[in-house]
């Protein structure tokens, strides 16, 4: 059997994901062609809708913010050999944590209530991920199974609380009252207007800056700290980690807590940045898209930011495309996103093997 060719790092990180996206769009183009629409025109409309105006860019980055947080949450768990697919539940609990602070303390000035709400969102997300980690360490319950279960538990708990405990009195919708202005994270156009910089209005808020800070934090933590080295060691070889004196259980608990805290930050973008209240299903599937983002980004913060922007383009551009081409429905945009996930994740080998073959031939010809 021939020895598999190891791709250069630049090819693995950039070339393979780009080719996966290209193949996914080609397949999606065939689907669009099959319903009688022009795939080239559809692609142009999608890109124009996402990047063709200041407002479109704002919406694209707003969606990307959610994907950055969930992508980072999945990625840091990946590095420890864990598969945290409970981002939905952790984000939901993060929203609950932020809402409880805002409902009780939004009479306080913004410089008190906002940090408390953000910390509460992170703490609730961390707790909701810590428990499955604890169950795996102490009881042997696999984290994949427990995080799936905790997604449903979080959704059920929040529904109960919204209907029976913290919901707005007299409201037919399961949601809380609107928070006071002091508990609202400023929109980016509002923040920049303070410095005399004008940009179009959009839901993009200061949480995008927090997402970039979180990306830098994960990069420093994973690759430039002792804890990060321990996390990567456990992920690469638990046996080697044990021989090195690293507690696998401790690393599992810490990593899951950090992962959950990052997922909880999604609630900051949605609840504090846009909605201004807690309502049902605000996470809208962002937690599961985060898995694809982490895979496409090769679990590296830079790759995750770029992959998040790509999915932000698909979300925003797809919305505009469905208006211009009614036959290209929102469900079809979801299918296109699914194709990107398919080729970037499950069928990654279909792209990697041909690329590796090309590099192998280049190496032989250069020998």
PLM segments and residue spans:
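Cytosolic-side transmembrane-helix boundaries in multi-pass membrane proteins
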Residues: 1-23, 29, 33, 216, ...
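Membrane-interfacial amphipathic/re-entrant helices at transmembrane-helix boundaries
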Residues: 2-70, 111-112, 116, 198-201
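Short loop segments and helix-boundary regions at transmembrane helix junctions
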Residues: 4-15, 78-87, 109-183, 221-226, ...
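Hydrophobic core segments of alpha-helical transmembrane domains in multi-pass membrane transport
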Residues: 17-33, 70-74, 95, 99-101, ...
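Single transmembrane alpha-helix segments in multi-pass membrane proteins
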Residues: 30-35, 45-105, 118, 122-141, ...
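Transmembrane helix-bundle core of multi-pass membrane transporters
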Residues: 54, 147, 151-224, 277, ...
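Helix-loop-helix "hairpin" substructures at the membrane interface of multi-pass membrane proteins
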Residues: 191-277, 301-302, 306
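Transmembrane alpha-helical segments in multi-pass inner-membrane proteins
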Residues: 257-338
């Amino acid at each position: 059997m021939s020895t598999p060719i190891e791709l250069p790092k630049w090819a693995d990180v950039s070339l393979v994901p780009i080719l996966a996206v290209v193949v996914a769009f080609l397949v999606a183009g065939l689907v669009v062609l099959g319903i009688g629409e022009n795939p080239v025109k559809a692609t142009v409309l999608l890109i124009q809708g996402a990047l063709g105006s200041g407002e479109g860019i704002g919406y694209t980055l707003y969606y990307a913010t959610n994907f950055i947080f969930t992508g980072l949450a999945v990625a840091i768990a990946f590095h420890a050999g864990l598969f945290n697919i409970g981002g939905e539940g952790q984000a939901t609990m993060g929203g609950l944590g932020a809402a409880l602070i805002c409902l009780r303390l939004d009479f306080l000035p913004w410089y008190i209530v906002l940090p408390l709400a953000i910390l509460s969102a992170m703490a609730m997300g961390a707790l909701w991920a810590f428990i499955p980690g604890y169950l795996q360490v102490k009881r042997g319950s696999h984290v994949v199974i427990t995080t799936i279960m905790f997604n449903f538990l979080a959704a059920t708990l929040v529904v109960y609380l919204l209907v029976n405990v913290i919901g707005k009195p007299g409201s037919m919708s399961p949601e809380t009252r609107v928070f006071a202005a002091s508990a609202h994270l400023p929109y980016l156009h509002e923040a920049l207007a303070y410095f005399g910089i004008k940009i179009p209005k959009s839901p993009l808020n200061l949480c995008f800056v927090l997402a970039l800070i979180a990306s830098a934090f994960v990069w420093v933590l994973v690759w430039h700290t002792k804890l990060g080295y321990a996390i990567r060691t456990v992920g690469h070889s638990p046996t080697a980690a044990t021989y090195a004196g690293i507690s696998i259980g401790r690393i599992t608990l810490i990593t899951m807590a950090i992962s959950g805290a990052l997922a909880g930050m999604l609630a900051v973008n949605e609840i504090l940045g846009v909605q201004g209240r807690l309502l049902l299903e605000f996470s809208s599937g962002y937690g599961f898209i985060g898995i694809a983002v982490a895979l496409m980004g090769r679990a590296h913060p830079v790759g995750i930011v770029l992959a998040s922007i790509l999915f932000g383009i698909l979300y925003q551009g797809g919305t505009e495309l469905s208006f211009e081409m009614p036959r290209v429905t929102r469900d079809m945009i979801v299918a296109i996103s699914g194709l990107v996930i398919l080729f970037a994740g499950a069928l990654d080998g279909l792209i990697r093997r041909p690329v590796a073959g090309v590099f192998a031939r280049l190496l032989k010809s250069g020998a």
